[in-house]
Amino acid sequence: MSEDLRPSGDITTALIKNNKKIKAKIISNQNCVIGGLSFAKEAFKYSDKKINFKTKTKDGKKIKKGKVVAVVCGKAKAILKSERVALNFLSLISGVATITKKFVDKVKGKSCKICCTRKTSPNLRSIQKYGVKLGGGLNHRFNLSDEILIKDNHIAVDGNIKEIVRHAVKNKKGKKITVEVDNLNQFKKIMGLKFDRVLFDNMNIKNLKRGV
C-alpha cells in the first residue's frame, strides 16, 4: 500500500466529495484457480478497518468466468484507494495457481511432481510459492540454505563436477543434494555418488530419456 500512497496519498480519490458507503463486487474475468483472498482483504482493511470483505469462494477453488469472488462494503474513498493493490494480489496469486494447475493436470496419474524454483520476483517469493501450492504444485527450496543445489555455474568455477559432489556429500549435514547436469557425460561422471536428485538442464528429449 505504501507504494501507492507515498508521498501524498491518493490525490485523485481525494477529489470526490461524496464519500458514501458503497458495495463493490470482485468478479473473475476468466476460468481460474482462485488465490489471494486473504491478501486482498488485508489490503482493504489497511485502507479502512471498517470495510466488510465477504468472500464467495475459497483459495484453491476452480471458478468460472463471471463468478463473484468477493463483495466489498464500505466508504467509497477507502475502497477506491485500495482496490488496485487488492486486485494485484488476487491476479498474481490466482495466475500462478492457474498455470500450475494446468501442468499438474498434464501429469496426473504419472509418477511426476510439479515443483517451483527460486526464480521469483524480489520480496514476493512466499506469495508466489503459495500460488504454486494452491495449484497443486510443490515448493522446491525457499532459499539457499534449504538444500544443496550444485548448478552449472558452481561447476564452471570449481572445474570438477565429481569432486564438488563428493565434497557436498561429506558436508551435507542432513540437507538434500541436487546436481544439475548439462549433458550425459557429466551425468556419467557422478553416477554412483550419494546425491539425492539430478536436474537435467536444457537437454533434448532423446538425451533426457536416456538420462532417466
Can you say where each PLM-predicted feature lies in the sequence?
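Acidic/glycine-rich phosphate/pyrophosphate-binding loops and surrounding catalytic core
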Residues: 1-193, 197, 209-210
